[in-house]
């Protein structure tokens, strides 16, 4: 196997038999099954529910020859919306509980100052621009999903063929992004509200403001897979020819229709947002994968040989336009209504010439061949050894050379936006495993193995080399009016009108400006790999109790990471007695960033030790319990769909983000206890019911988003 360095899921689909069988099922949960009270504090709880309906049917079309199986599932989901609400009057307190926010429902005057109401903003946009920004509080969202699967099995003679089709569609609603990239929050949101302590937060989703429903987005997830397998027998040789095609399509959608992203400030902090999330317009991911594998196996004496050859082709398409519908930041509602120059502005536009969206795409192929021998050394001892060879093939990045960027001097070096790793770098990944029945009765079993596994590079990073080169699309923005290099536009509802604004003087598409944050790929970039070893002991204890003790150790090699060629080490500075910091500055006169996809060091690792007990009783009761202790050091786990977010966020940094360092693994739970009890009752001849109780206790390992997350005293900036 190949293509992963973490966990793998082995999915086996049902098939039809000579007997017609059908099933139907339903699962449900709703608002009332979710708690909303912590001690004496009651949380806002919007309506939500999820009900799953499913059915399957299988049987024979031709007895003993041709079988079918189909399954369908539909989820009726209603997702709770945001919990924040507006003030209904001047006497309402805000910010004290995180629920009531600063904006008012209707225009209100407090202390001689007038605050525009959310209802009044909606009314103005409807009358002026025929635009409905949607709701802003007290709403839920429908996010239905469905899954269908069909399978045919044909027993010809010694040859057997099966065909499988699956399609899933789902979507979920997300809050608007808190990021303002490429803007700088500290500049466009200078902050400060009424001078009150605890009320000076200035982010896009802070409680100083509220956003309309149009600022949310629906992330769709569509996955289609077609697979076929032909099993044949040629004398002593068994052969399996497999074909798989998969299509992953993940567009974003939003309410309200095309409109610019607009942030209205009040005293330097966000007051109201409407229009789409700034990263949603034109945002999509598409990955098409084609795999063909021919695999054989045969036995000779104690040897069971298996070998094969595989060809894989991937095409990744990424649509990403920061401020793709325009992004305006106004210092006040009055500035917006009177069409004054925006305090900050940004837009990404296509260079195709016909106004159509530019879609970055990249192709990647890989040829693999492998051989394995499973040797039955004795009746009690089995040894398996194998090796896999892989040859990656990268195509050229056509029409992706930005000559203006290539002229920038990065501390004595120049880089090209169309460079790629060298193709035809053959890699070998050996692996070995054993299974030893110590007594010959399967009472005590020792098993383990060790192997070197080649993974995959993050395609969304690689394809950004196309999207961020300013060849297919260009981005213009300014954080402050004094930095408006190409001018300040009036307000327009379409990008086409923004580009025609006489106040803007953007570079011609035929001579695109150097990007301010290009993606550069290391010519020597290698596939990430993991060396993984495991050792386990299984025992049947007195009382027919199953006991397992298992240890796992893995070490990372060549994990992909992102550094910034636009920054260089300046020197050390003592900012306080005994507190010496490394300082950095731009490496070029243009003050341009260049995000460099390269390999980190080889110091990341993971280990775990698990002990488990399980027992099944004759009367239908099953009990199990396990404890896992795990530990990991990583280079940041590659978090971030964008190279700039991967560089700045979730990085373990003491000496700057360009000095890749290890820190605690992001998703590893140091301690985890799992216990379960299941009881199955049979009745009325053909019926049975099962009741299960599951307990899980663990330390959260995620880098952010949970109050129980691991605390760290390693930061990415000065404290």
Give the location of each predicted region:
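Solvent-exposed loop/turn elements at secondary-structure boundaries
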Residues: 397-429, 433-599, 719
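Short, solvent-exposed micro-motifs at the edges of structured domains
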Residues: 394, 516, 526-533, 539-719
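Acidic, glycine-rich flexible loop segments
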Residues: 1-8, 14-211, 218-224, 233-236, ...
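Residues on the lipid-exposed face of transmembrane beta-strands in outer-membrane beta-barrel proteins
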Residues: 11, 55-59, 150-154, 228-232, ...
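Hydrophobic, lipid-facing positions within transmembrane beta-strands of outer-membrane proteins
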Residues: 5-7, 51-55, 146-150, 222-228, ...
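Transmembrane beta-barrel strands of outer-membrane/channel proteins
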Residues: 24-30, 70-74, 163-167, 241-247, ...
């Amino acid at each position: 196997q190949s293509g992963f360095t973490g966990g793998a899921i082995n999915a086996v689909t049902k098939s039809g038999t000579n007997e017609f069988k059908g099933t139907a099922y339903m699962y449900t949960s709703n608002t009332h099954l979710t708690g909303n009270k912590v001690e004496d504090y009651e949380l806002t709880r919007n309506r939500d529910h999820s009900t799953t309906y499913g059915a399957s049917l299988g049987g024979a079309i031709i007895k003993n020859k041709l079988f079918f199986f189909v399954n369908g599932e539909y989820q009726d989901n209603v997702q709770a919306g945001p919990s924040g609400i507006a003030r209904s009057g001047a006497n309402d307190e805000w910010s004290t509980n995180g629920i009531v926010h600063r904006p008012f429902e209707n225009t209100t005057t407090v202390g001689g100052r007038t605050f525009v109401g959310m209802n009044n903003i909606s009314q103005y946009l409807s009358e002026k621009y025929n635009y409905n920004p949607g709701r802003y509080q007290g709403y839920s969202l429908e996010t239905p999903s469905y899954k269908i699967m069909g399978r045919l099995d044909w027993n010809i003679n010694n040859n057997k063929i099966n065909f499988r089709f699956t399609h899933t569609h789902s979507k979920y609603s997300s809050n608007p992004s808190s990021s303002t990239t490429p803007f700088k929050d500290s500049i466009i949101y200078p902050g400060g509200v009424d001078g009150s302590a605890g009320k000076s937060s200035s982010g896009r989703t802070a409680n100083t403001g509220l956003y309309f429903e149009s600022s949310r987005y629906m992330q769709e997830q569509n996955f289609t897979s077609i697979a076929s397998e032909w099993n044949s027998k040629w004398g002593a040789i068994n052969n399996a020819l497999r074909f798989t095609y998969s299509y992953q399509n993940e567009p974003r959608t939003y309410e309200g229709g095309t409109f610019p992203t607009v942030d209205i400030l009040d005293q330097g902090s966000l007051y109201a947002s409407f229009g789409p999330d700034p990263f949603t317009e034109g945002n999509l991911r598409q990955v098409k994968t084609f795999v063909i594998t021919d695999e054989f196996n045969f036995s000779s004496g104690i040897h069971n040989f298996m070998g094969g050859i595989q060809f894989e082709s991937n095409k990744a398409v990424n649509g990403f336009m920061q401020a793709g519908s325009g992004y305006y930041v106004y210092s006040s509602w009055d500035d917006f209504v009177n069409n004054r120059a925006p305090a900050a502005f940004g837009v990404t536009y296509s260079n195709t010439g016909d106004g159509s969206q530019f879609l970055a795409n990249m192709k990647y192929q890989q040829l693999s061949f492998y051989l394995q021998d499973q040797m039955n050394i004795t009746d009690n001892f089995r040894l398996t050894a194998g090796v896999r060879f892989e040859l990656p093939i990268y195509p050229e990045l056509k029409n992706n050379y930005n000559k203006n960027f290539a002229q920038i001097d990065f501390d004595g070096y120049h880089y090209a936006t169309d460079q790629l790793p060298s193709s035809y770098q053959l890699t070998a990944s050996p692996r070995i495993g054993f299974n030893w029945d110590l007594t010959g009765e399967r009472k005590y079993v020792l098993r383990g193995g060790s192997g070197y596994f080649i993974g995959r590079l993050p395609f969304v990073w690689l394809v950004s080399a196309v999207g961020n080169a300013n060849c297919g699309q260009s981005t213009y923005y300014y954080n402050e009016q004094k930095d408006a290099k190409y001018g300040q536009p009036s307000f327009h509802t379409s990008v086409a009108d923004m580009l025609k604004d006489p106040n803007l003087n953007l570079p011609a598409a035929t001579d695109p400006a150097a990007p301010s944050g290009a993606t550069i790929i290391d010519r020597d970039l290698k596939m990430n790999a993991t060396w993984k070893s495991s050792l386990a002991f299984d025992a049947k204890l007195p009382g027919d109790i199953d006991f397992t003790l298992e240890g796992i150790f893995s070490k990372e090699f060549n994990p992909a990471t992102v550094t910034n060629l636009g920054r260089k080490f300046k020197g050390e500075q003592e900012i306080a007695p005994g507190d010496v910091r490394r300082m950095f500055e731009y490496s070029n006169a243009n003050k341009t960033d260049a995000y460099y996809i390269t390999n980190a060091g080889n110091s990341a690792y993971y280990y775990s030790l698990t002990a488990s007990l399980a027992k099944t009783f004759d009367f239908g009761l099953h009990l199990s319990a396990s404890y896992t202790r795990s530990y990991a050091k990583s280079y940041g786990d590659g978090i971030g769909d964008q190279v700039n977010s991967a560089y700045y966020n979730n990085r373990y940094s003491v000496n700057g983000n360009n000095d890749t360092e290890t820190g605690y693994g992001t998703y590893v739970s140091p301690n985890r206890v799992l216990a379960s009890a299941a009881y199955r009752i049979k009745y009325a001849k053909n019926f049975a019911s099962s009741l299960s109780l599951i307990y899980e206790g663990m330390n959260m390992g995620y880098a952010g988003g949970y109050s129980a997350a691991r605390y760290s005293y390693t930061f990415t900036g000065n404290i």
